[in-house]
């Protein structure tokens, strides 16, 4: 409904122009229009995403190393291990630097020798690890209850949930779709520019969405049976991955092995997403300023590391920094990206591909339907032109409402926006790491 049509549009813009977002608008926009001015929004979005994603990806690598070395064996207080890691700016910086080095190092090798080859290996390894972890979890005694909890729907909680209304659940799902598919910032259009014209884009986008769902389902098959098998609450929330699961693996036979494999799976997924977005950033610089790939790496690598430091310091040195209605440094960066840049960017792609003042519907369909495969459905034109923009606006407005309510409460209570309450580091959307598997699956590096 939302993600696939926009993904098709990003692919079409990239493939028709054979350029990154830096030049794709300029190549396709009607003469006299100014769509190319919006390219900077995409670059800012990619940077914002990486400013906190590299840090979270660093956590996953750190946990893989700790699990492989047996750090969690016999550890009663996993929270102390996690707190010690994010509370140490030097350790956190080290893991972030490792992520940046791996990501830019792979991209520096080029598309075929670097990004394409490494990502193919990582994705193959990812699915092998996932299958092994799924089999292990499904064979655990007591795991059946976890399967029932995970796979049997409870519609009463959907419509009568004290924690969230049905509208809030739908809004969250739409926002999740934008984030998972990395649409709205041009990171998918760059991979569209690498596609040949022998395949129609609708089928490619649908396959990516289905793969996204498959990875999400498999992740649930790994986690929930294990939680029920060892009496762990499945609604432990953000702390589930980094605080609860190490205890679960500790109780398993060969738990050190399974724990290391699980965090290797999460780290591989997250790293493949980092590589994909790094490639979009580098191609933007190469197209916009006409510089070589090596020079683009030399400029963007230190810049991204520097801009990632506020997120690193937000968990320790700047832990007292709070924005009411939003949260800490990482939450602020996520808010600007997920609640603003992603929906606005998605709306711009839709308007560009459906309006006469933009590229236009006819040219979009012509490009999307080149080659063999599934055509973009003709009946979807009205939905894409009017329904999708309406949904995007709903996501944008609903994303701001809770924050505005808090700000208005401060205003009428005579408070100041500098005042703020405590925000636990575990408010971090740790599902980013799991989403990395889905995002990486959404990067068609080579047709």
Residue map of PLM features:
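Loop-to-transmembrane helix boundary motifs in multi-pass membrane proteins
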Residues: 89-94, 211-217, 256-259, 268-271, ...
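Juxtamembrane transmembrane-helix boundary signature
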Residues: 1-30, 226, 230-233, 351-360
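Membrane-water interface regions at transmembrane-helix termini and the short interhelical loops
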Residues: 34-50, 83, 87, 98-122, ...
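Membrane-embedded translocation segments of transport machinery
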Residues: 116, 120-271, 275, 295-296, ...
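C-terminal membrane-solvent junction of multi-pass transporters and transport-like membrane proteins
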Residues: 37-46, 289-301, 334-392
């Amino acid at each position: 409904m939302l993600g696939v049509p926009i993904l098709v549009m990003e692919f079409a813009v990239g493939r028709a122009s054979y350029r990154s977002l830096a030049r794709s608008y300029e190549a396709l926009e009607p003469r006299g229009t100014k769509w190319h001015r919006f390219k900077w929004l995409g670059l800012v979005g990619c940077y914002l995403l990486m400013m906190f994603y590299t840090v979270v990806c660093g956590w996953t690598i750190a946990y893989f190393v700790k699990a492989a070395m047996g750090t969690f064996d016999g550890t009663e207080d996993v929270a102390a291990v996690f707190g010690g890691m994010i509370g140490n700016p030097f350790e956190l910086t080290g893991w972030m630097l490792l992520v940046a080095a791996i990501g830019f190092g792979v991209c520096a090798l080029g598309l075929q020798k670097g990004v394409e080859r490494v990502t193919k290996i990582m994705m193959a390894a990812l699915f092998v690890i996932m299958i092994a972890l799924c089999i292990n979890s499904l064979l655990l005694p007591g795991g059946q209850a976890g399967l029932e909890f995970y796979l049997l729907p409870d519609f009463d909680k959907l419509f009568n949930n004290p924690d969230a209304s049905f509208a809030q659940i739908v809004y969250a799902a739409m926002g999740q779709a934008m984030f998972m598919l990395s649409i709205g910032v041009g990171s998918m259009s760059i991979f569209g520019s690498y596609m040949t014209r022998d395949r129609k884009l609708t089928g490619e986008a649908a396959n990516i969405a289905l793969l996204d769902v498959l990875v999400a389902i498999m992740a649930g098959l790994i986690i929930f049976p294990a939680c029920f098998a060892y009496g762990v609450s499945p609604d432990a929330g953000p702390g589930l991955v980094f605080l609860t699961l190490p205890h679960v693996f500790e109780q398993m036979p060969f738990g050190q092995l399974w724990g290391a494999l699980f965090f290797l799976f999460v780290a591989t997924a997250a790293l493949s997403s980092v590589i994909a977005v790094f490639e979009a950033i580098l191609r933007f610089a190469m197209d916009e300023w006409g510089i070589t790939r090596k020079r683009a790496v030399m400029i963007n690598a230190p810049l991204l590391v520097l801009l990632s430091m506020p997120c690193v310091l937000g968990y320790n040195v700047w832990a007292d920094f709070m924005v009411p209605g939003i949260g800490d440094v990482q939450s602020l960066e996520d808010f600007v990206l997920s609640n603003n840049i992603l929906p606005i960017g998605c709306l711009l792609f839709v308007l560009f591909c459906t309006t006469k003042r933009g590229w236009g519907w006819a040219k979009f369909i012509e490009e999307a339907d080149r080659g063999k495969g599934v055509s973009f459905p003709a009946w979807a034109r009205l939905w894409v032109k009017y329904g999708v923009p309406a949904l995007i606006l709903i996501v944008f407005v609903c994303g701001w409402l809770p924050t505005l309510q808090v700000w208005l409460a401060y205003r009428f209570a005579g408070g100041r926006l500098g005042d703020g309450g405590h925000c636990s580091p575990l408010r971090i959307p740790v599902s980013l790491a799991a989403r990395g598997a889905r995002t990486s699956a959404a990067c068609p590096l080579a047709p």
